[in-house]
Structure formats: C-alpha cells, structure tokens
C-alpha cells in the first residue's frame, strides 16, 4: 500500500489537537502522533484492513501526492515485484493552522478578497461561499477541502485470474521538478515536461487519431490567478502541438475545493465517471473564463454536460508547491480491453468475463448494503497478530501461522554488478 497526505492531518484528533494540548493545559492523547504522521494512512490499512506483510510506503509531493503514490504502485507492478497495490491518500486539513498558513502565502480565497471580487464583478455584497473556488475564471484564491480516496491496481494477469471488474488502466505517471526557482511556491517549467511526455505516451500507444479525438483534460485548476494563466498555457500549447482541436477541460476543485494530497484521487474518480457516463463535470462557479486564460485549442466546460463524441482518455494533472509536477492518463475500460486483446487469447478473455459476472453481482449487492448502511467497515483489530512464536524461519523462507509462505529470493544477481 502506498498512501498518505501532503501536509499532515490537522484536526483535533491529530496535529491540531497535539499542538494545542500543551498551551491549553490539556494532555496529549497517545493517538495524536499516530494520526498526525503522513504515512499512517498506509500503515492503518496494512494493520487493520488487509493485514499486508508486503511492500508499503508513502511519497509526499505536495498537491501531487496522489499521483506520486500512483506512480509508486504502477512502477511496482511493471517491475514484477507486486501484482496488487493499493494506492491513495487521505487528509484532514480543514482547520485554523491550514487557513493561517495558506493565507500567509496569499493562496486562499478569503472573505475580504471575495467581497472585493464580487463587488468588482457586480455580484453584490452577500458572499456566496458555493462560488469561492473559481478555476480559470476571475478568481482570488483556492478553497480547502477534505477527501479520501483509494484505488486498487492489479497486474493484468491477476485481474483476469480473479475476474476483476476492470474499470480502466494507467500506462505511466510522469513526474518532473521545476528546476531553478525564485519563490518555492511559484510555478516553474516542470509541468510542461510532465504534460508533454504524457501526451506523447498516449500518441505512442494508441496513435495520433485517438489522442486527438478521444481525450479530455482534468486540470489541477486551483482557483488562483497565477494557476489559471500557467496551466491553461501548458494545456493549450500541447493541444496545438499534438493537433487536438477542442480538448475538453475542467477542474473538479470548483466543486470539492483543494483537498491537498488527495486532489489527484478526486481527479481519478471524476475521470472514471466521465469515461463511463460520457459526461464531464463542469466549472459551474464561473460565468466566463478570465481574459488572461489561454483558450486556443481548448474547450473549457463551464457546465455539466455530455461529450460531443466518445472519450476514452482522461488526462490528470497535478501542480504542487515546490515544483512537484505529475501527470498521468486514465484509460477507459474500452481501450483497456483492447490492450488486453494484444496480450491474451480469446479463450483467456472469455474465461475472465465469465468470472467477472460473479464479481459484478457481489459488487451490486455490497453497494446496496452500503447505501442502506447495512455493511460494516473492515476493522481487523488484534486479529492474527504475529509474534516470534508464529514464524517458522529458515534460510529459504519465512512461514507464518496464518499460512503466508514468503520465499527469501533475491531480486539481484551477480551480473547486476
């Protein structure tokens, strides 16, 4: 499992509660540190959900954290070291420390700023908090949100063997730093590299026609004046270079706010929904694009609407403070199945679809249980805890009382060195 957060968890059960306890004359809880540390999102999944003894970790990449963890999972599967990886993020960021910090950076859409903007635009004096986050429109800053999201990645072999409901795939995640900077929080050149490389990945695997006709773009779209200029220029530039005439563009932050480390997972769910329903969520908080937004070869969706043609690729873009740029592309189940046809026989794919029927039935059943609050969350507290007496250790393997047989095989050979 690779999961965590971008900053830290800051609610009263974690960082805020820990730091406020002493000044307020209260005692810190033994859980405060555990809930504060970024990598504990993965640790709690390993300890209380999956019972995993496998590879784990967390990559912090500011606002690109989710895509950093996605990259770790994708590369682990491509290397053959794992066949199933859970990737994701969870961040409790809403609280005074976050607002104070981001406001000091000039990044927040504060009441004062939005009052001035609304008066300037003739929108009246009554603040409309539902329209505080305005990506690519006349805006004054971002809005903090909270979210949690996880995805299960599998090798194609394992997915077919277990009859998985394959909703799409990722080919690659491209990550680039900004190089030399003046302001550490300011944007740089790195996102040009990550976006351009991802466009090239799609063109290489699926061809120019598919890239040009079947793509949409889920922008980072924070709602800051600088982001609307820099990111729109990046997307417009590569849309022109790769011959895309009207690339659909949106930002889910207009509805969810900026969930920090989890922002990339928000984009994944938005992308999945868009490719499955052929409808894209719009930037519904702005009446029009700002004058300084680059629009050439782009089609910004300012309302929820259907695509005018079949889309099978959703680009996901993250621009994080410090120069943490990550871009990937979510491939639809339709194109994913075509990729599987290149690797597996018709008989193997038919067997997978047969197994998938049971998976879909179970999925529908569990969905109904969840909607009706009739399903309990998995919380394996103090179950199958292993100590020294539960391990059978030899030079060749480590066996546990729970049935796990871990072969001590090295990934290295002498020829590597």
Predicted feature locations:
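Active-site-proximal alpha-helical scaffold in enzymes
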Residues: 38, 42, 46-49, 57-91, ...
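Nucleic-acid-interacting cores, centered on viral/eukaryotic replication and modification enzymes
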Residues: 2, 74, 78-81, 99, ...
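Conserved small-residue
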Residues: 1, 66, 73, 102, ...
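Acyl-CoA/ACP chain-elongation machinery
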Residues: 81-143, 173-188, 219-228, 245-298
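Conserved catalytic cysteine-centered active-site region
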Residues: 8-22, 26-72, 105-143, 234-266
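Glycine-rich phosphate/pyrophosphate-binding beta-alpha loops
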Residues: 62, 182, 256-261, 318-324
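Conserved beta-ketoacyl condensing-enzyme motif
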Residues: 1-59, 84, 90-101, 203-233, ...
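Condensing-enzyme catalytic core mediating Claisen C-C bond formation in acyl metabolism
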Residues: 113-208, 215-216, 333-394, 398
């Amino acid at each position: 499992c690779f999961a965590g957060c971008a900053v830290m968890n800051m609610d009263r059960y974690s960082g805020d509660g820990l730091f406020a306890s002493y000044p307020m004359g209260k005692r810190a809880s033994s859980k405060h540190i555990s809930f504060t540390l970024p990598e504990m999102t993965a640790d709690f999944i390993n300890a209380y959900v999956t019972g995993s003894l496998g590879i784990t970790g967390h990559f912090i990449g500011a606002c690109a954290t989710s895509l950093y963890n996605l990259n770790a999972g994708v590369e682990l599967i491509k290397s053959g070291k794992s066949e199933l990886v859970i990737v994701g993020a969870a961040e409790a960021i809403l609280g005074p420390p976050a607002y104070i910090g981001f406001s000091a950076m000039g990044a927040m859409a504060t009441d004062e700023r939005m009052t001035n903007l609304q008066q300037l635009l003739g929108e009246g004096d009554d603040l409309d908090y539902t329209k505080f986050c305005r990506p690519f429109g006349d805006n004054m800053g971002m809005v903090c949100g909270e979210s949690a999201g996880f995805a299960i990645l599998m090798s194609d072999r394992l997915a077919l063997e277990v009859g998985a409901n394959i909703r799409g795939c990722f080919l690659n995640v491209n990550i680039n730093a900004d190089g030399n900077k003046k302001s550490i929080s300011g944007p740089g050149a790195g996102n040009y590299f990550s976006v351009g490389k991802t466009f090239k990945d799609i063109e290489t695997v699926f061809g120019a026609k598919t890239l040009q006709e079947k793509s949409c773009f889920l922008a980072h779209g924070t709602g800051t004046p600088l982001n609307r200029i820099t990111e729109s220029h990046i997307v417009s530039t590569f849309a022109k270079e790769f011959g895309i005439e009207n690339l659909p563009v949106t930002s889910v932050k207009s509805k969810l706010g900026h969930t920090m480390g989890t922002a990339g997972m928000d984009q994944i769910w938005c992308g999945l929904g868009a490719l499955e329903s052929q409808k894209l969520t719009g930037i519904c908080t702005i009446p029009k694009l700002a004058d300084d937004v680059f629009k050439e070869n782009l089609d910004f969706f300012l309302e929820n609407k259907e695509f005018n043609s079949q889309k099978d690729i959703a680009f996901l873009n993250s621009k994080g403070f410090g120069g943490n740029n990550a871009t990937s592309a979510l491939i639809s189940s339709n194109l994913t199945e075509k990729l599987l046809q290149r690797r597996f026989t018709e008989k193997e794919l038919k067997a997978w679809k047969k197994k998938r029927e049971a998976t879909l039935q179970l999925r529908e059943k569990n969905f109904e249980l969840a909607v009706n609050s009739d399903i309990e969350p998995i919380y394996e507290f103090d179950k199958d805890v292993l100590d020294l007496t539960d391990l059978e250790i030899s030079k060749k393997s480590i066996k546990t009382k729970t049935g796990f047989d871990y072969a001590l095989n090295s990934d290295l050979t002498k020829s590597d060195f």
